[in-house]
């Protein structure tokens, strides 16, 4: 039997993550991930700046119609001396092999199963 691709997810905000100046203190922005589909999914966040950008929780499991708020934090930095162009966070998700899975497993993303992703560019308002 062929594996079905993961259904869409929704993020709030839908397009980008925004951090406002000043950047001399840690700042946190919240993103809600919503699973409007009918299957349980596993999700994981990645970023192009792992030393500056942190996510909590960085991964998890969402049942059908469930949602979770993820805190995306930006550590203090100097935008005049550090390149921030192209910074983004990416959420990847896949169907869980076990419909009753409650705990995230990295192996879901390492096999030959279908993984979808959504990029959220980071905008720094200086």
From Swiss-Prot:
Record's protein name: Major sperm protein 3
Coiled coil feature spans: none
Record-linked PROSITE patterns: MSP
Cytoplasm is among the record's keywords: yes
N-acetylalanine found at: 2
Predominant localisation class: other
MSP domain mapped to chain residues: 8-125
Species for this entry: Globodera rostochiensis
Function, in words: Central component in molecular interactions underlying sperm crawling. Forms an extensive filament system that extends from sperm villipoda, along the leading edge of the pseudopod.
Entry GO terms, CC: cytoplasm; cytoskeleton; pseudopodium
Locations listed in the record: Cell projection, Pseudopodium; Cytoplasm, Cytoskeleton
InterPro entries named among the record's database cross-references: Ig-like_fold (IPR013783), MSP_dom (IPR000535), Nematode_MSP (IPR051155), PapD-like_sf (IPR008962)
Tissue: Sperm.
Assigned keywords, A-Z: Acetylation, Cell projection, Cytoplasm, Cytoskeleton
Residues spanning the membrane: none
């Amino acid at each position: 039997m062929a594996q079905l691709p993961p259904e869409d997810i929704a993020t709030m905000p839908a397009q980008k993550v925004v951090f406002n100046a000043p950047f001399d203190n840690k700042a946190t922005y919240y993103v809600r991930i919503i699973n409007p589909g009918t299957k349980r999914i596993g999700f994981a966040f990645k970023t192009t700046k792992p030393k500056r950008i942190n996510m909590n929780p960085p991964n998890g499991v969402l049942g059908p119609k469930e949602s979770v708020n993820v805190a995306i934090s930006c550590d203090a930095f100097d935008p005049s001396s550090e390149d921030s162009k192209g910074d983004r966070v990416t959420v990847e998700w896949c169907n869980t092999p076990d419909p009753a899975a409650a705990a995230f497993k990295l192996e879901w993303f390492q096999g030959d199963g279908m993984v979808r992703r959504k990029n959220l560019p980071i905008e720094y308002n200086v």
